[in-house]
């Protein structure tokens, strides 16, 4: 794999902190350094690791402008474009490009434990995800906003019966203007089109108080179980202005 800064020089202590504990791979400021985790690139084309891959990981700061490409190999756990545990911190403009390989668990473009996630993206062109889901923008807890994130899937497969594809996911915050683009335009029943054993969600709020607004799912081909442009799963919340565009493919339920 390669790890590099595309535009500015990272502190040596950050740029060289590549973890192999449990075979995790990625730069991290787990010592809570003051620097934001930004402008890293990971290109993974190895055989297999038991753990996860991330473009950046921080205990205390924003994470932005990081990119992860998975070309081949077997990753036992998760893939993150960037991940922050910092309270109120933002994951923004992080990207993942999947062109091959097998991933055991979920994929997150930008993951914030208790902040916000904006303008993150995942592009899946090939490969397999054995369990769980793909998220462009994800906030694990609290009412942080998740906006303007996008998942594009033109090939590959998500196999788990509980799998899902989420443009944006928040625990109880505003989930707005997120997008899922599934399949390839102009080829409604093409061989090799992507498949998802589970569900497509443009925007998803898991808890009461969440809002799912103006999210979009567009399906061109391939196969999925169900489609929801916007959903608030529990309690009291609003799902408004969400849209599904179905141009081809198969929705099995």
Tell what function each PLM region has.
Residues 1-52, 57-78, 84-106, 112-133, ...:
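Surface-exposed loop/turn motifs in large extracellular/passenger domains
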């Amino acid at each position: 794999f390669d790890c590099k800064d595309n535009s500015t020089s990272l502190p040596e202590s950050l740029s060289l902190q590549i973890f192999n504990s449990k075979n995790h791979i990625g730069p991290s400021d787990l010592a809570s350094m003051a620097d934001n985790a930004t402008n890293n690139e990971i290109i993974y084309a190895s055989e297999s690791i038991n753990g996860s891959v991330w473009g950046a990981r921080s205990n205390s700061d924003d994470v932005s402008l990081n990119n992860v490409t998975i070309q081949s190999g077997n990753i036992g756990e998760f893939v993150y474009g960037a991940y922050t545990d910092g309270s109120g911190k933002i994951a923004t403009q992080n990207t993942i490009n999947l062109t091959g390989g097998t991933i055991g668990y979920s994929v997150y473009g930008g993951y914030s434990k208790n902040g916000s996630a904006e303008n993150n993206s995942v592009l899946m062109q090939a490969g397999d995800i054995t369990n769980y889901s793909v998220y462009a923008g994800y906030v694990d807890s609290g009412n942080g906003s998740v906006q303007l994130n996008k998942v594009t899937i033109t090939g590959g497969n998500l196999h788990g019966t509980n799998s899902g594809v989420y443009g944006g996911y928040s625990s109880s915050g505003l989930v707005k203007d997120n997008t899922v683009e599934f399949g390839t335009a102009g080829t409604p029943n093409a061989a090799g089109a992507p498949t998802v054993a589970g569900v497509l969600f443009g925007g998803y709020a898991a808890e009461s108080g969440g809002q799912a607004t103006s999210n979009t799912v567009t399906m061109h081909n391939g196969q999925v179980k169900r489609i929801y442009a916007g959903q608030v799963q529990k309690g009291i919340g609003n799902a408004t202005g969400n849209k599904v565009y179905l141009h081809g493919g198969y929705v099995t339920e």
